[in-house]
Amino acid sequence: MFKKIVKFCLCALVFLMPLFFLPSSVEAFEFNKGYLLFFLVSVGLLAWLGNMVFKNKKVVFRRTPLDLFVLAYLGTMTLATVFSQDKITSLFGYYGRFWPSLIGILSLGGFYFLVTNNVEIKSETEEKSDNKVGQSSLIKAFIWSISFVVLTTYFSLFGFWTKISNYLVSINESLALPDVMVYQGFNPISGSTEILGIFLSIAAVFLLAYLAFKGLVSMRNGAQGVVEKKKQKRQTIFNYILIFSILGLLLIINFWPAWLIMCLSLLAFLIFSFRKRLFKKDVNYLSLPILFLLISIIFLFFSPLQGLFPANSVVNNLPSEILPSQKVSWNIAFQGVKESPLVGSGLGNFSYLFNKFKPESFLNSTVWQIRFDKPINYFTELIGTTGILGVLSYLLLIGMFLLVSFMIVNGKDASSHNSLFTLSILLAFIALIIAQFFYHQDTTLAFVFWFFLALGVVSWKKVVKETTFSFKDFPEIGLICTVIFWAILFGFLFFYFTMGKLYIADVYYRDYLANPTEMKLASEQANSLQKAGQLANSRTVYHIILARAYLGELIKETQQPGPDNQRLANIVALTVAEGKKAVELSPNRVTTQETLGFIYRDIQGLAEGATEWGITVLERAIELEPRNPILISELAKFYVGDSGDMEKAKELFKRALEVKSDYVDAAVSLSILEENEGNTEEAVRLMEDLVSKVPSSVDARFQFGRLYYNQEQYEKAIEQFEIAMQLFPNHSNSIYSLGLVYQKKGDNTKALEMFKKVLELNPGNIEIKNRIDEVSRVSTPETEPETEPEE
């Protein structure tokens, strides 16, 4: 029973990890894969331990040269969590991304020991062991998983899921497929087409090497029975179809790192094969790897398919990830090491580093407002978030694995079944390492890394030792192991309960996003978002969203004709409490400080001391993100408000412009301050400089026109307002201001036309109606009595 559970958990993990997703949570892929990984690994570990303690009555543990390196790596990841800038993120993963996390990495460590102690490598002629899981079971599960990934992706690319969903809806609306599946770029690996390309390139390398070596071994084994030959022929046909299906997807995705990974890995495979003369008796087994190598080289340097497909085709409309460049990612990583050399910013905390150290050049890009939570490649994240200890432990782990594997495949029995299997695993592992230099890692890629690592270690038969402690010889060990088993069991049960609450909370949060409802002040009437916050009190993100939702309710209440003061006070208290809770949980996350700062900004007239608290909080936010002109400008506005320190405000607005010279809000606000102080020339200069840098900004054009209007330079004001209207034809402020200019110039007809247009956009506006009445009276003179012509 225990052995069957272990085998099921291992095979289910290998098969399901690339495929598993659920639409019930906010993020369908990484979040659910993490739960699957933790649950199946924990069940497998319990079954393995239970089999030793309660059935075999002995502890059997395989010792390998890599075990200490794995434990050292897990230890450094734990240290990186303990000393993290944001421990919640390090433990559970950055919300929305979820990988890496300490729980996920420890689960992968458990998976490694589960594989190395319960899987054995067997040739086709060897009998299956009753005690261990055969490697063929896991390889078959992995190949079938790849097959379903490929099939699912083709269905998505060519709209089959949409057609299936529409057909099901025609039968019953409740049968509709989840929204995530009808998205054209859907694939079960993740929401990223690029990650899919990386995964497929690694899968292709493994399959090409594995099938070549499998064919070589079959040839050596000689004649087979008729049934076995037919079975092998069917498998060969299936594998060829799968490999060329993968190639088709790679051609559609056409992601250059995927081609590079395949190119370098297959090149290493061919060089080693020729050097060792592995295929000297039948070089035809190398035909397919050579073909794929040539294709990868061609598509790495050229794009032969470019222009062959229409602009609206699937090939030309695949979604792509927006990520920091290689240069930016490496720069931020080294800045993180400088700040915290040993353990970095903490596991999963790349967002902290990016916010704090993003370069000035990034602010000139079109995506300058994005706070990236991951770099473009995994090694930069490892360097910045886990420091020297993390990188060193990881490199030693990889180095030791490569060293022992190379020793085995270079040994005297390099052409044996065991060595050939090791070589196919080694090539896939090398492909994974190459991938980590060029793209970031998700849960699936991390799992595949540890899967090949564990299988490679299992193939080191000669250097793997077994240690056995029989309970008959050591009764004390039996008692200790029994206690350990129950302690681990209850520990896992506690984690199941805790993580179950977190999962239900996320389901509530997704329900709120799909159907937003009013925030309730009484806990017994809590909506979905409030229930999420109550269930997952340790999740910072829910408190941030709750604070913003309460703030929205507060603004809505203040806009009521007769606001309820008691209700206002209650909402203010709840808003501040949620903002403070978020800061308490993650004081080094800029979004928590920013949210609380904006709360204090919006309640200045409702709560005593809000200005002082707002200044303090935003100053802390700016420490965490010094190159954010928005935060600096919002801090400046606190000084424009109650404190009235105009010089400080001007200093901060200028600082915001130093950070980003074309930031509209700072330039406009500074221009208004200069205008109010009578420095009209400086105000005009600021606006001229702004519109030259951001000519398409409606706000800049409107404010420039307003400035000219106040100076009675009506022609220049008209020019700016008209440009603003060209950019945004329904911009009410520009249309209204243009009407005022025409009214000042005495052109009441045009003025009336502008005001009526504003009324169409803002029906029922009393001020506009009064303005129209005023202009109408002036433009319609009283009728004079007729006079008879003189004779």
What kind of region is each of these model predictions?
Residues 2-23, 39-49, 69-81, 101-126, ...:
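Alpha-helical transmembrane segments of multi-pass inner-membrane proteins
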Residues 161-187, 311-324, 330-339, 347-384, ...:
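Interfacial juxtamembrane loops and adjacent helix segments
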Residues 186, 262-266, 272, 285, ...:
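Flexible juxtamembrane loops connecting transmembrane helices in multi-pass membrane enzymes
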Residues 302-317, 480-520, 541-545:
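Hydrophobic alpha-helical transmembrane segments in integral membrane proteins
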Residues 505, 540-541, 590-591, 629-630, ...:
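Helix-start (N-cap) detector for alpha-helical repeat units in TPR-like alpha-solenoids
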Residues 552, 602, 641-642, 676-677, ...:
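Register position in tetratricopeptide repeats
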